[in-house]
């Protein structure tokens, strides 16, 4: 579906929901060294809602990663390392960026859009609560706006994703244009290959191609865990044996957005559903 950023303005309520990965979208302007982006941000969100025929908009904030850090203290530990060598000017610029994002979120809320953020909770998990309760909330279709492929774990017949970075859609219908396995194996793929951005280790020597081959041969991550150890002369298979079922199980907990949604949002799931239900019914 073509996107037109000229078609801005408040959308008409219709039961379709746009869920925006708030900080993820804001980085679009950060990468352009543009720190005065409030107007452009709101305009873009409204344009996307119109383009995807979404009558309701929810923008999610990130409040931390408490749940996953209790599972693995090294989760996202590389983020601090990434910023430790910032100059004072870079630190000030980043603070200004975060302040502008805060102002933008307040502006979105003042315009009547729903914004949700909890201390210690990732935006991914708030999105998961909403997406997995789509029918109960009386929603038709959901469009996820994020460049984060982790959100593809939520894709189904009624939930799709658009990346403003690649400008590509990922839907159930075009899934095979992006991946060489069925959607139900995406979690397995991630558990095997890991996630460098989140500091989640994968199996050494297993990249996308080998992960896809293992899925075809053994099935999902639980099938693989039950099959280990696997006798093989290949080094990457020996690495998989050493990686072990326990680490694969940890990766499942870290990466599966639907594993325990209430725990992941620190018990806020009912509050999230109440906020969305009230917002949708009010519109």
Predicted regions and their residues:
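Noncatalytic, basic helical substrate-engagement surface that gates or grips nucleic-acid strands
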Residues: 2-141, 153-169, 249-250, 256-262, ...
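Conserved, surface-exposed functional patches that form binding/active-site neighborhoods
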Residues: 157, 176, 204
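A short, charged helix-loop
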Residues: 167-197
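Accessory alpha-helical DNA-binding modules that contact the DNA backbone or grooves
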Residues: 185, 193-264
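Conserved cytosolic headpiece of P-type ATPases
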Residues: 268, 274-275
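Long, highly charged low-complexity segments enriched in Glu/Asp and Lys/Arg with interspersed Ser/Thr
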Residues: 277-283
């Amino acid at each position: 579906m073509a996107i037109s950023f000229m078609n801005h303005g408040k959308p008409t309520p219709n039961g379709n929901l746009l869920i925006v990965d708030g900080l993820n979208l804001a980085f679009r302007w950060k990468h352009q060294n543009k720190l005065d982006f409030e107007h452009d941000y709101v305009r873009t969100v409204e344009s996307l809602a119109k383009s995807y025929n979404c009558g309701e908009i929810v923008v999610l904030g990130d409040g931390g990663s408490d749940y996953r850090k209790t599972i693995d203290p090294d989760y996202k530990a590389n983020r601090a390392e990434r910023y430790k060598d910032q100059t004072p000017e870079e630190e000030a610029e980043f603070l200004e960026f975060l302040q502008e994002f805060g102002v933008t979120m307040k502006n979105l809320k003042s315009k009547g859009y729903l914004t949700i953020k909890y201390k210690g909770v990732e935006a991914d998990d708030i999105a998961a609560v909403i997406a997995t309760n789509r029918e109960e909330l009386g929603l038709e279709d959901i469009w996820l706006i994020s460049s984060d492929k982790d959100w593809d774990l939520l894709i189904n017949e009624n939930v799709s994703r658009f990346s403003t970075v690649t400008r590509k859609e990922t839907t159930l219908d075009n899934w095979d244009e992006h991946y060489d396995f069925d959607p139900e194996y995406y979690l397995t793929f991630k558990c095997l290959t890991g996630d460098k951005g989140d500091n989640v280790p994968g199996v050494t020597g297993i990249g996308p191609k080998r992960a896809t081959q293992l899925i075809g041969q053994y099935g999902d991550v639980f099938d693989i865990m039950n099959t280990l150890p696997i006798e093989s002369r290949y080094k990457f298979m020996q690495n998989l044996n050493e990686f072990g079922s326990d680490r694969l199980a940890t990766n499942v907990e870290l990466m599966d957005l639907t594993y325990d949604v209430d725990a992941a949002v620190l018990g806020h799931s009912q509050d999230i559903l109440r906020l969305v239900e009230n917002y949708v019914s009010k519109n």
